[in-house]
């Protein structure tokens, strides 16, 4: 778990926002500022930004998950009208933000993790620890669920997804076992099938990588990440800050490549003596390397 940056726990809700102190350090919220939490979840980061930007900083809080958004809205109901809540995908960030009057922002946050609300509710289908429907959709209205991927996608495509998005070395074996066991009934059945194909390693559940891969495919998480970062950059005021909290190497790679590219001028190959691309520096990287979660943070958010 780490955060890349360019130029409070709440026991009542059982929610501990990830790396909140680091987020506040780099976003440096101030009164009068405009901020976007593009993945608000249960609202922990938004709450901290509101507190730091009082009395009149404003936050646009976006999430694809209607259940999480409703909880965030309830817990922040005394915000004095400083938060605007919108259900939507962060890949549509620019359209949503402009419609709500949030351009020229001082800070934008993307927390790419799956929330405890989603993991703890077996009915959402994210967890392999309890039986639940094969769902895994962040947006319950989205057309593709895990059931479609697991029970209907061709074996070759399933293997590709598990290898690419789960970095599972036994992807072809796992995909073959899944196809053989169809129809897969629920998440417990899927976890058992995968566990029969993959040995446990390093204390990690054998189904961890496969579940991650299917979730990423269902929600097009990497495509959404690639789509949202240029939009976030376009919405920042001069001197504004974008912070991204990533949880695995696939996300981290996309974020790093974007920030490195946009912190450079000409992107033409060295063999071309005069710039033809016209690319200009778009941001300053505030950290050369991702900010890693502290040991205490990992203990609070394992």
Model-derived regions: residue spans:
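S-adenosyl-L-methionine-dependent methyltransferase catalytic core, i.e., the SAM/SAH-binding region
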Residues: 1-302
């Amino acid at each position: 778990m780490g955060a890349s940056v360019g130029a409070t726990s709440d026991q009542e809700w059982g929610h501990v926002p990830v790396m909140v102190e680091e987020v506040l350090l780099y976003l440096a919220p101030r009164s009068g500022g405009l901020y976007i939490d593009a993945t608000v979840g249960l609202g922990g980061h938004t709450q901290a930004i509101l507190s730091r930007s009082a009395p009149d900083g404003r936050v646009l809080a976006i999430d694809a998950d209607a259940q999480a958004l409703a909880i965030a809205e309830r817990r922040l109901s005394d915000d004095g009208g400083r938060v605007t809540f919108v259900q939507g995908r962060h890949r549509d960030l620019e359209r949503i933000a402009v419609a709500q009057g949030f351009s020229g922002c001082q800070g934008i946050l993307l927390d790419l993790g799956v929330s405890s609300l989603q993991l703890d509710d077996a009915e959402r289908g994210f967890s392999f620890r309890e039986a639940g429907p094969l769902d895994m959709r962040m947006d319950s209205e989205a057309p593709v669920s895990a059931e479609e991927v697991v029970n209907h996608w061709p074996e070759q495509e399933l293997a590709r997804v598990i290898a690419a998005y789960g970095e599972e070395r036994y992807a072809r074996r796992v995909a073959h076992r899944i196809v053989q066991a169809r129809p897969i009934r629920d998440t417990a059945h899927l976890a058992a099938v995968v566990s029969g194909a993959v040995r446990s390693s390093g204390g990690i559940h054998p189904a961890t990588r496969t579940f991650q891969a299917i979730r990423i495919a269902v929600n097009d998480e990497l495509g959404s990440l690639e789509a949202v970062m240029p939009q976030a950059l376009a919405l920042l005021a001069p001197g504004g800050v974008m912070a991204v909290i990533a949880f695995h190497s696939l996300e981290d790679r996309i974020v790093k490549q974007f920030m490195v590219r946009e912190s450079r001028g000409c992107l033409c190959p060295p063999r071309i003596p005069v710039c033809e691309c016209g690319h200009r520096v778009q941001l300053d990287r505030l950290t050369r390397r991702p900010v890693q979660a502290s040991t205490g943070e990992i203990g609070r958010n394992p």
